[in-house]
From Swiss-Prot:
Active site: C2 (nucleophile), K602 (for fru-6p isomerization activity)
Lineage of the organism: Bacteria, Fusobacteriati, Fusobacteriota, Fusobacteriia, Fusobacteriales
Record protein name field: Glutamine--fructose-6-phosphate aminotransferase [isomerizing]
Top class in the EC scheme: transferase
Residue span, SIS domain: 280-424, 457-597
GO MF term set: carbohydrate derivative binding; glutamine-fructose-6-phosphate transaminase (isomerizing) activity
Provenance organism: Fusobacterium nucleatum subsp. nucleatum (strain ATCC 25586 / DSM 15643 / BCRC 10681 / CIP 101130 / JCM 8532 / KCTC 2640 / LMG 13131 / VPI 4355)
Gene: glmS
Keyword field contains Transferase: yes
Stored CDD domains: GFAT, SIS_GlmS_GlmD_1, SIS_GlmS_GlmD_2
Domain of life: Bacteria
HAMAP family (alphabetical): GlmS (MF_00164)
Amino acid sequence: MCGIIGYSGSKANAVEVLLEGLEKVEYRGYDSAGIAFVTDSGIQIEKKEGKLENLKNHMKNFEVLSCTGIGHTRWATHGIPTDRNAHPHYSESKDVALIHNGIIENYVEIKKELLEQGVKFSSDTDTEVVAQLFSKLYDGDLYSTLKKVLKRIRGTYAFAIIHKDFPDKMICCRNHSPLIVGLGEHQNFIASDVSAILKYTRDIIYLEDGDVVLVTKDNVTVYDKDEKEVKREVKKVEWNFEQASKGGYAHFMIKEIEEQPEIIEKTLNVYTDKEKNVKFDEQLEGINFHDIDRIYIVACGTAYYAGLQGQYFMKKLLGIDVFTDIASEFRYNDPVITNKTLAIFVSQSGETIDTLMSMKYAKEKGARTLAISNVLGSTITREADNVIYTLAGPEISVASTKAYSSQVLVMYLLSLYMGAKLGKIEEKDYQKYISDISLLKENVVKLISEKEKIHDIAKKIKDIKNGFYLGRGIDEKVAREGSLKMKEINYIHTEALPAGELKHGSIALIEKGVLVVAISTNLEMDEKVVSNIKEVKARGAYVVGACKEGSLVPEVVDDVIQVKDSGELLTPVLTVVGLQYLAYYTSLEKGYDVDKPRNLAKSVTVE
């Protein structure tokens, strides 16, 4: 991981295209960057550890005319972040250059074999092993050579390869790692992310697992896993990169926080009819909900916390066993799956490898699979039995905000749809739940207008090193997402707990200077939360309350983020928006790179 781009064109501007494309995928996170391009004297590789700017400055030393090349931003999985471990990688003879997203599981045994044959390696990566193997097995034909290589390796990968014997050609393939082809006029592209090439084309081919593609400036030839030449559908991407630009905001994150009212309204308008009934008939075709006796919601990170909200909605409204699991653990927890199981997989990018592998496992066990994703044509949406798209639009900041809200809202609507199908929700309650969505939108707008109050709180807590986020019931799910936002862009250790669990050990860590964020949107449990606040205040904690109007929390805390009532199930979503602001402004005050936090990637495509 993380970003791939390739170019073959009639103009000698490959380096410019590659650097521009890598800039567009910086948001995915990386620790080094590099490019390889074909010149009259062969293949030239230039790469640098650190920010892309380092590579750009380095390239100012060269005057390069090249029509074909590949580029990569790397996130270290094998070998520390250095120039030598950055992609692309040569073969020893420098006839091959290769970039790779993924992990080669058996690289150690192949490397040992190549070392015994006298091959000299110049990096510590699993990727270089593939470049060296390709060179060793090369038979004068790119396609047959790559097929021999793929028979030797195990793992997940998206490869892009150039060879000195074919100066105008790239050969690429994918297996459980995203790769697309962009079609232009006398120029064609490959990329891991459509953002990288939107400046040049909106005509996209989404490759499937097992596909191998040969790309020149005028031709794209795709072979499937059975080695048959196939025609993949060309899809037109509707959004352009300008939609993903900052639009006058200081950072993508705050822009995306403040796009949430629009997304709430769009989701309501698209997924309900004029009578305000949820219309998922097309998306959920073929599912008989009367046959479903168990539901799993599986995801990673923020999507998992959105899934916890979805679990709460479904258990409350449907009376069905609903379980959530972290995707990286799902396969190893021996989930009970039958043909009466509905397994829901949530992924913003649709390319999260742990989630994809979990879905594959569930399908093999006989579950009906439903994907909730933000990216049209992504792997998860192609492989699931059914798909509901979130309508968040491109999310660039690594810290997810609007994607979370849209995931929660889709699961809320899904719960209402299922409840109506099963006769579990009375009509008056159903209409109240639907009207709460419009109320949520109005109240997010109001919260946005009051954001400077949250900024003031952030100024007071910016130097705090440790914190706890507490809540009860659905608010405990809010606590988890709030805690994650704070830690991922502020590098503050925070822990989310059910408020009642604090006294079972963790209260030993409460002392002066510790931050506690106490969440209370359910007035039935408000007094218990107030009691927990008093416990931590007595031990010196600085307490920020996050609650709805009518709560007693403001009377006992140091600062408060107070939101308006948006209904029993959606007020917690509004509270999360407040906690997104708190994390954002704290990071701003600390002077950190809000959109690109250290050690994080937007889309995690390795296990």
